[in-house]
Swiss-Prot record:
Protein name: 2-C-methyl-D-erythritol 4-phosphate cytidylyltransferase
Reaction catalysis annotation: 2-C-methyl-D-erythritol 4-phosphate + CTP + H(+) = 4-CDP-2-C-methyl-D-erythritol + diphosphate
Record-annotated site: Positions MEP for the nucleophilic attack: R164, K222
Gene Ontology MF terms: 2-C-methyl-D-erythritol 4-phosphate cytidylyltransferase activity
Function: Catalyzes the formation of 4-diphosphocytidyl-2-C-methyl-D-erythritol from CTP and 2-C-methyl-D-erythritol 4-phosphate (MEP).
Gene name of this polypeptide: ispD
């Protein structure tokens, strides 16, 4: 099976309150940068053939050195990201389209992942890739622990309470049949329509495409706020302990 991966890693960590637009991908958890953990997971996933990363210009040489020093051979290209997350993914998509045209080989699936989600596991990546190839689309998610409410017309007053049993918190990597994801990004670019994730693009332009749910654990967090670094240390320790038992 051939899976191609795009990692969006251009976040500057505004909510992390980092100085000088520093990349949150370089924050250390367990003595290694966040992006190191992310690269390692995809390197170890058996279904993954190549990985394209979009990041900040200043991070490109640093990321390349991390990949080289650690033998992350599946990292195919590390390029400059765009203004928005969707633009960054689009930049990688252009390279993937060129590779498809040159090789004449269509991947079985394309996965899109947030670089700031360092705890996705290789076996989960493989599961999502296979389900994406089989069903055309697959997105990981977790059940919310908290009650979710709408905000009312008055932004200081709650509206209705949502039925938590029908809600899921969506994560990445999100996997898709390559042709549909490529076309969805092309159409969104023409329309200048931006979404917060790739599943929303596929939902908009291919409403007939069912998206398979892949329920993950609560370890696959996105490093977004300062508290997440401390939570990440605990998650990493738990993952290591679980692996040592096995």
């Amino acid at each position: 099976m051939k899976t191609v991966v795009i990692i969006a890693a251009s976040g500057v960590g505004k909510r992390m309150k980092l100085d000088g637009g520093r990349s949150k991908q370089m924050l250390e958890i367990g003595g290694q940068p966040v992006i190191w953990h992310t690269m390692k997971a995809f390197q170890e996933a058996s279904t993954v053939e190549s990985v394209y990363i979009a990041t900040l210009p200043d991070s490109i040489p640093v990321f390349k050195e991390i990949a080289k020093a650690n033998g992350f051979t599946k990292i195919t290209a590390i390029i400059e990201g765009g203004k928005e997350r969707q633009d960054s993914i689009g930049n990688c998509m252009k390279l993937i389209e060129q590779e498809i045209e040159n090789s004449g080989v269509m991947p079985d699936a394309i996965l899109v992942h947030d670089g700031a989600r360092p705890f996705i596991q290789p076996e989960e990546i493989d599961d999502i890739a296979r389900l994406s190839a089989t069903h055309g689309a697959c997105v990981p998610a977790t059940k919310p622990k908290d009650t979710i409410k709408y905000v009312g017309c008055n932004p200081e007053i709650f509206g209705e309470t949502l039925d938590r049993s029908r809600l899921l918190q969506v994560q990445t990597p999100q996997g898709f049949a390559p042709a549909k994801l490529i076309e969805a990004h092309r159409l969104a670019g023409e329309e200048q329509w931006y979404a917060t994730d790739d599943a929303a693009l596929v939902e908009r332009y291919f409403p007939q495409q069912a998206i398979r749910i892949y329920e993950t654990g609560y370890h696959n967090i996105k490093i977004t706020t300062p508290e997440d670094v401390f939570i990440g240390e605990a998650i990493l320790a738990g993952l290591k302990a679980r692996k040592s038992k096995n």
